[in-house]
C-alpha cells in the first residue's frame, strides 16, 4: 500500500510540474535538457552540448554519444558512441 501511494504521489507531482512548464515535450530543433521536464517528443532524441543543455534531433550522427542503437542515424551504438560499422 505504501509503495502504491508513493508511486501515485510521484506520478502526480511529475504531471503537475510538467503542466506548469507548459508543453510536455519539445519538437525537433527546440532546446532540451534530457530530463522529464524538458524532453523531446516521439522518437527524437536530445543531443546534449553540455550537461542539461541540448537540442532535439531526429537521430545522432557518427561519433556522438549514445545509449542505444536506436539513438543513432546508423542504428549502431558501440561503446557509447554512434558508429558506421556494425558491432559484434
UniProtKB/Swiss-Prot annotation:
Subcellular location: Secreted
Pfam families in the cross-refs: UPF0506
Source species, domain of life: Eukaryota
GO cellular component: extracellular region
SS bond partners: 59-73, 66-77, 72-82
Keyword Disulfide bond: yes
UniProt cross-references to InterPro entries, sorted A to Z: UPF0506 (IPR021712)
Transmembrane segments: none
Keywords from the UniProt entry: Disulfide bond, Knottin, Secreted, Signal
Signal peptide: 1-22
Domain notes: The presence of a 'disulfide through disulfide knot' structurally defines this protein as a knottin.
Protein name, as recorded: Uncharacterized protein SJCHGC09803
Native source organism of the sequence: Schistosoma japonicum
Amino acid at each position: 500500500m505504501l509503495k502504491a501511494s508513493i508511486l501515485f504521489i510521484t506520478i502526480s507531482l511529475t504531471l503537475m510540474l510538467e503542466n506548469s512548464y507548459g508543453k510536455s515535450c519539445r519538437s525537433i530543433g527546440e532546446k532540451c535538457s534530457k530530463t522529464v521536464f524538458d524532453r523531446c517528443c516521439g522518437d527524437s532524441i536530445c543531443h546534449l552540448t553540455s550537461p542539461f543543455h541540448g537540442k532535439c534531433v531526429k537521430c545522432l550522427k557518427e561519433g556522438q554519444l549514445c545509449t542505444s542503437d536506436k539513438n543513432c542515424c546508423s542504428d549502431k551504438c558501440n561503446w557509447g558512441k554512434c558508429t558506421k560499422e556494425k558491432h559484434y
